[in-house]
Regions:
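N-terminal small/polar loop signature for handling phosphorylated ligands or for N-terminal nucleophile
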Residues: 1-21
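Short glycine-/acidic-enriched loop or helix-start segments at secondary-structure transitions
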Residues: 12-15, 35-37, 140-141, 168
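Gly/Ser/Thr-rich active-site loops/lids in small-molecule metabolic enzymes
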Residues: 90-98, 145-166
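Catalytic core of DAGKc-family lipid kinases
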Residues: 18-23, 27-131
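A generic structural signal for short beta-strands and their flanking turns/coil linkers
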Residues: 111-113, 125-127, 150-155, 189-191
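ATP/nucleoside-binding phosphotransfer catalytic cores, i.e., glycine-rich phosphate-binding loops
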Residues: 121, 148, 158-232
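Glycine-rich phosphate/pyrophosphate-binding beta-alpha loops
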Residues: 75, 79, 130-144, 212
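Short acidic/glycine-rich loop or secondary-structure boundary segments that cap or lie
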Residues: 79-82, 125, 137-140, 164-168
Length: 232
């Protein structure tokens, strides 16, 4: 099976497969191609086809949130609200730059409700969190710096700082690969993650692989080595 598109298209295919072990090839053509970046896939049609023809495969983990499968991450809080409000034309033209600009503007102006997150035996209060299967997020932002798509774990980064300085420094850190090291960020690893409302606040939105998916509560789990992809 060959997919031509971005992360949203890949997500639809993964959900359509519903666990069927069919090797999947990806020819990147979307506005953001985080999975392709993570796997080192070429971004030209000819080279991407050559990777598929070579036949080398890699099994990666697949996450599940409230019944929906994903390959990249679940983002909760202001990033999901940003996805909800992001102008499609801006997304196509500016990619991750449009995302960060919209996120900063939205969070600084309006803020967002806190929520509770449980990862393993640890609990956090946050206004933004990512349960990640991969390092990269929204493009080349290294939010979950230790994540690997085949390690059987979700890497969680929780953040709680609404100040402009805090937000800018967090996203700058993510751009150079150490977003989880921010003073206001907390990292954890787990096979299951739960997100819930805090103090009657809500609704709190979440996004899956860059697409708006719903509101909390949400339960995230992982299927190890559940998807086979063609890789270089």
């Amino acid at each position: 099976l060959v997919v031509v598109g971005g992360d949203g298209t890949v997500n639809e295919v993964v959900n359509g497969l519903k666990g069927a072990r069919v090797p999947v090839g990806i020819i990147p053509s979307g506005s953001v191609n985080v999975l392709s970046l993570e796997l080192g896939l070429p971004h030209t049609v000819e080279k991407a086809c050559a990777v598929i023809a070579a036949g080398r495969t890699r099994d990666i983990d697949v996450g599940i949130v409230n019944g929906r499968r994903f390959t990249l991450m679940v983002g909760v809080g202001f990033d999901a609200l940003t996805v909800k409000n992001l102008n499609p034309a801006s997304k196509r033209r500016y990619n991750e730059a449009a995302f960060v600009w919209t996120a900063l503007r939205k969070e600084v102006r309006q803020g967002g409700p806190d929520f509770v997150m449980k990862a393993g035996d640890r609990r956090f209060l946050a206004n933004f969190a990512v349960a990640a299967n991969t390092r990269y997020y929204g493009g080349r932002f290294g939010v979950a710096r230790k994540a690997q798509p085949d390690d059987g774990r979700l890497d969680v980064v929780a953040f709680r700082d609404r100040s402009l300085v805090g937000l800018v420094s967090f996203w700058f850190g993510a751009l150079v690969g150490w977003g989880g090291l921010h003073v206001s960020a907390t990292e954890a690893r787990a096979q299951q993650v739960e997100f819930g409302l805090y103090g009657g606040c809500g609704p709190v939105w979440y996004q899956v692989d860059g697409e708006l998916a719903g509101t909390l509560p949400a339960r995230v789990s992982l299927e190890p080595a559940a998807l086979t992809l063609y890789v270089p």
